[in-house]
Amino acid sequence: SASYASLLKDQNVQPYVRNIAKFAPVPFDNGLALPAKYLVFTRAKAVTLTAQEMTEKVAASTSVFAANGAQTLRFGQIITGNDIGQHLLGVSYQSMSAIEATYDALAQDTNFRQLTAGVEVNMRSIIQLYT
């Protein structure tokens, strides 16, 4: 598209990886209207869990994300590129303190502990958004 071409040419962006993910049906509606300031992406490879089990564990943990400040949450499987078959969790937040509170609470959540025990996390990125 023209927008993508402009991003590469005018903004001097150089993508080093590009993937497409198929999102899983994980209900999440925190209802927060504030604009997100941070995105956290976590990529993981299944070790002992099936894709269905991973989706169920993420879905069972969404209340912990919401209670600690997550604004949006999406989970899916990467279907193109170098990381095909791996899973991606994307969550938006208003602040770094909300990210920290969420991960502190997730460490106590049985479903999330079972999820992390059954996968190999191989990438986590925190991206600050500027508006």
For each feature predicted by the language model, list its residue ranges.
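Short S/T/G/P-rich N-terminal loop/turn motif that feeds into the first structured element of a domain
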Residues: 1-131
